Amino acid sequence: MSKKRRQRGSRTHGGGSHKNRRGAGHRGGRGNAGRDKHEFHNHEPLGKSGFKRPQKTRRDVETVNLRELDEDIAVLVEDGIAEESDDGYVVDARDVVEDGYEADVVKVLGAGTVYNELEIVADAFSESAEQALEVADGEAVLSERGEELEAEKDSTDEEDEES
């Protein structure tokens, strides 16, 4: 049965109240009326925008400060995370950081003062961390992963210089 046939005998033919089909007031205006005021929410832009970094360039970096390592060294030795040696203490930063083994890179930052001789093994060090360790007669040792990252960085630097 057609809509026209179904609406026979109906006073308003599906328009609700008899007032609703008069003018354009029931619709809030005709066409694009009100698009900057009362119908503004209907005109938000859709779709993608912006820039997404390629997944291969993204790295999950976990950080730890020298201050934390130096202050907590006694607890770390007690828990078996750090080892005491003749020259001082040996710490693997991956063991200290909560998600160290899940992270792509574990980086040591240079905040704080170092009072103990620390030999820290990590994937990356900030310049200030390396300097602070040198001043305290400590050592910054790159892990295997850190050496791979350095090699990658050097190869990309050479490619950039050629182009």
Swiss-Prot record:
- Name the coiled-coil region(s): none
Keyword RNA-binding attached: yes
Which superkingdom is the protein from? Archaea
Which GO MF terms are attached to this record?
A: rRNA binding; structural constituent of ribosome
Where composition is biased (Basic residues), the residues are 1-29
Which InterPro entries does the UniProt entry name for this protein?
Rbsml_uL15_N, Ribosomal_uL15, Ribosomal_uL15/eL18, Ribosomal_uL15/eL18_sf
Q: Which Pfam families match?
A: Ribosomal_L27A
Q: Where is the composition biased (Basic and acidic residues)?
A: 33-46, 142-154
**Which biological processes are named by the entry's GO terms?**
translation
What's in the keyword line of the UniProt record? Answer: Ribonucleoprotein, Ribosomal protein, RNA-binding, rRNA-binding
One GO cellular component this record assigns the protein to is: cytosolic large ribosomal subunit
Region listing for Disordered, in residue ranges: 1-59, 135-163
Q: Which family does it belong to?
A: Belongs to the universal ribosomal protein uL15 family.
Role this protein plays? Binds to the 23S rRNA.
Mind telling me which HAMAP family this protein's record contains?
Answer: Ribosomal_uL15 (MF_01341)
Assembly mode: Part of the 50S ribosomal subunit.
State the name under which the record lists this protein: Large ribosomal subunit protein uL15
Q: Which gene encodes it?
A: rpl15
